Curated annotation (Swiss-Prot):
This is Homoserine kinase. It catalyses: L-homoserine + ATP = O-phospho-L-homoserine + ADP + H(+). Pathway: Amino-acid biosynthesis; L-threonine biosynthesis; L-threonine from L-aspartate: step 4/5. PROSITE patterns: GHMP_KINASES_ATP.
Amino acid sequence: MSVVSAITVTVPATTANLGPGFDCIGAALKLYNEFRFTRLEEGGLIIHVSGTEAERVQTDESNLLYQAFVKFYQHIEQTPPTVKIEIKLGVPLARGLGSSATAIVGGLVAANQLEGATLSQSQVMELAIAMEGHPDNVVPALLGGCRLAATSGTAWEICDVPWHKDVVPVVAIPNFELSTSEARGVLPTEVSRADAIFNTAHLGLLLRGLETGNGQWLKTALQDKLHQPYRKALIPSYDAVNIAAVSAGAYGMVISGAGPTLLALADQLHSEAVEAAMLAAWQEEGITAEVRSLSLDTQGAKSF
């Protein structure tokens, strides 16, 4: 491929961990950020932002999207071109839906496409994981679908996790934020053998439940002892929303990524009732939230 003058990249939101799959599993959702990069012959960096919470996005060289763009050129040992970047935000910031992953993947993919696809998808993925520090958001953001990532220490193995068509992700996005650093700060530095075994078994069951749509397996699988017991205290009325979701027919509810968005899994028959129940539970506590059922994105980052 030849060098091009402009490129647009769309990157999906992601939900990570899915309960027991802490830092190793995530799924792409049909909710997107769009980034357009245009080469400039002169002048300096220009960043325009529109959409969800646009005023909160940095428009200088500290912008994460731009930092990822520059990272690509550092990797190939070239000077990055001067660009105008137009950002259309659809993924809420700092809500546990992978907004930072969209920026990292978007910047790397855009740079790679501007330079004629110099790097393979696997190489782009390795750069994205290195920037993010963990694979569970950037991998599905890049590749789409539900993905499990494991490393031997030198390379990553990525596994596509089949997701049954009758398993519906329902996200409840509150009007408050929770930073990833704060959510990681409450985690213990060591866990017991019993808790490690618990999560290993439940992750295995989760994978089979997602593949088959077996509701009983999912009800059991969506439990965790490594991160959610510590993080849920940072999310007001977590228990009330959980009870409401399950009472309305959800298989279970988990924290999406680092939170504060909550993710319930339900079947097609109960998804609307689960939406309404989660919304009402937070409203009763005076918390405004957007609750919606989303489909799985199977394509990942796209450029045109």
